[in-house]
Amino acid sequence: MKTFKKYYELPTSPDQVYLALTNPNTIALWTGSPAEMSTEPNSEFSLWDGDICGKNVEFEENKKIVQNWYFEGITDDSIVTFKLHEGKRAGSTSVELTHTNIPDDDYEDMMHGWDEYYFNALIDFFEEEGE
């Protein structure tokens, strides 16, 4: 099992990033797929037509999100933590992402997925929104 940690800078405020990560209607806008999401601890979530699913563990509005992602055949908790901070540039947000207990065989795909499908999609969404 491996851990992935990376910082991403998004061109918007922490409250807008939090909304984009927790509101199912906003998630559908940047992913292009329906989403099931709630900010209730212990609620189930589903993204990208069920390709990503798990349980919401903890929320600190506009600051932190903790989720347990499910991997087929893996019983260990795979914890994803998003920590939101004011970014270095005015009006931006630094997102500290930590994803623990990634199965070795899935690690490269997960790294690519975080960059390409998750955070590049969010950056594109906020850049288009700002135009």
Residue ranges and their predicted role:
Residues 20, 30, 68, 105, ...:
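Residues that scaffold the ATP/ADP-binding catalytic core of kinase and kinase-like folds
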Residues 28-32, 37-73, 79:
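Glycine-rich portal/gate segments that line the openings of hydrophobic small-molecule binding cavities
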Residues 7-11, 46, 55, 83:
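Generic structural detector for well-ordered beta-strands
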Residues 12, 44-48, 109:
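Alpha-helical scaffold segments that form or flank carboxylate-/histidine-based iron centers
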Residues 17-18, 27, 45, 56, ...:
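Hydrophobic pocket/interface hotspot
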Residues 1-36:
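Hydrophobic ligand-binding cavity/cleft-lining segments
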Residues 3-7, 51, 64, 79, ...:
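Intrinsic-disorder/low-complexity, polar/charged segments enriched in Ser/Thr/Lys/Arg/Asp/Glu/Gln
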Residues 72-117, 121-122, 131:
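Beta-strand/loop substructures that line and gate deep hydrophobic ligand-binding cavities in soluble
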